[in-house]
């Protein structure tokens, strides 16, 4: 038996399965014949007993109970071998199924590789044709036939003349020049009669902000407390009322040490109501104070943001001539008034 079990290696599983089925069939038939011979007293076939190879010393034509027991044990052994062969067959089927699936995947991959190879071959031929055409165009010097020639010509010979022509032919209106000159005039020249210590007129300003302008700007002004609190810069909330002044001690000590008076529950309720009534008034007063502080702090900012007043700058170079003309006009007016009075 062990030899037969160990033999199941290196040979097809179908041969072992067919052999085990035939052995099981032969032993079971012989066992049933022994049962019939015991029941009827008929003789057995000695050739079948020899084929079974039972460990019997004397093989007789008549069935005995000992022979029946040996046949049953032999049938059990053959059945075990047959069951082991079936298990191996099941494993073989699983492995064969996996092999078939892998073969299908390999076939699909082979098809994909073949299609990719064909596409690669087509692309290669297409690129070869394009390169050959471009080489011909480059050798012939026809820049209009291929894109490569156009790029090379643009890189080798930049069109500087055309760009210069565009710059020269570009028109600029006088209004644009005047407006631009007006914008930069306040920072490029000083006013007539400028003095270094005197403040500048509203139309003129220095090219860079001065110290006074920087000090009066928003960067040098301290923001109000509620703004500091909003950005997390204030350590104490100034808008909340302080309750320390309103809280009274529950014990009042008189002149003597022993005289200690404790307030009743009604008095405590009255004090709490008074404190609750005073809280909104204190909050309103503090909010008004904070608003006044913010307004006072924002006044320099508003003064900066307000547009400067227009100043009439007298740029007359000959004030004496103008004054004499004005005097003549006044004399004429006086003469006319006198004539009217005499009339």
From Swiss-Prot:
Q: Does the keyword Phosphoprotein belong to this entry? A: no
Which intervals carry biased composition (Acidic residues)? 317-343
- Domain of life, per the record? Eukaryota
Q: Which GO terms describe its cellular component?
A: core mediator complex; mediator complex
Any GO molecular function: transcription coregulator activity
Q: Name one GO biological process term.
A: regulation of transcription by RNA polymerase II
Q: Where is the composition biased (Low complexity)?
A: 271-316
Ranges for the region named Disordered are 247-343
Question: Cellular location of this protein?
Answer: Nucleus
The disulfide bonds in this chain are none
Keyword Nucleotide-binding, does the record have it? no
Assembly and oligomerization: Component of the Mediator complex.
Q: What does this protein do?
A: Component of the Mediator complex, a coactivator involved in the regulated transcription of nearly all RNA polymerase II-dependent genes. Mediator functions as a bridge to convey information from gene-specific regulatory proteins to the basal RNA polymerase II transcription machinery. Mediator is recruited to promoters by direct interactions with regulatory proteins and serves as a scaffold for the assembly of a functional preinitiation complex with RNA polymerase II and the general transcription factors.
Full protein name: Putative mediator of RNA polymerase II transcription subunit 4
Q: Which organism is it from?
A: Dictyostelium discoideum (Social amoeba)
User: Source taxonomy lineage?
Assistant: Eukaryota, Amoebozoa, Evosea, Eumycetozoa, Dictyostelia
């Amino acid at each position: 038996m062990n030899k037969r079990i160990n033999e199941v290696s290196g040979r097809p599983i179908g041969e072992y399965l067919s052999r085990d089925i035939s052995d099981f069939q032969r032993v079971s038939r012989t066992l049933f014949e022994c049962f019939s011979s015991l029941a009827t007293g008929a003789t057995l076939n000695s050739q079948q007993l020899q084929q079974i190879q039972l460990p019997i010393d004397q093989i007789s034509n008549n069935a005995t109970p000992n022979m029946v027991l040996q046949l049953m044990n032999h049938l059990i052994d053959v059945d075990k071998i047959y069951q082991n062969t079936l298990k191996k067959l099941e494993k073989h089927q699983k492995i064969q199924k996996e092999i078939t699936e892998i073969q299908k995947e390999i076939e699909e991959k082979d098809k994909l590789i073949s299609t990719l190879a064909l596409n690669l071959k087509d692309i290669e031929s297409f690129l070869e044709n394009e390169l050959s055409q471009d080489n011909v165009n480059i050798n012939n010097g026809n820049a209009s036939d291929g894109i490569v020639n156009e790029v090379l010509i643009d890189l080798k010979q930049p069109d500087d003349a055309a760009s210069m022509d565009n710059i020269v032919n570009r028109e600029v209106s006088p209004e644009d020049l005047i407006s631009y000159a007006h914008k930069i005039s306040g920072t490029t020249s000083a006013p007539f009669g400028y003095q270094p210590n005197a403040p500048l007129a509203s139309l003129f300003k220095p090219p860079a902000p001065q110290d006074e302008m920087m000090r009066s700007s928003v960067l040098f002004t301290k923001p109000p407390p509620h703004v500091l609190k909003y950005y997390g810069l204030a350590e104490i909330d100034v808008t909340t009322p302080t309750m320390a002044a309103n809280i009274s001690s529950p014990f009042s000590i008189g002149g003597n040490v022993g005289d200690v008076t404790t307030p009743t529950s009604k008095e405590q309720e009255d004090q709490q109501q008074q404190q609750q009534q005073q809280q909104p008034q204190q909050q309103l007063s503090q909010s008004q104070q904070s608003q006044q502080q913010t307004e006072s702090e924002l006044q320099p900012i508003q003064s900066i943001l307000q547009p400067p007043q227009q100043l009439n700058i007298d740029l007359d170079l000959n004030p004496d001539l103008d004054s004499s003309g004005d005097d003549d006009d006044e004399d004429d007016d006086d003469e006319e008034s006198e004539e009217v009075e005499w009339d």
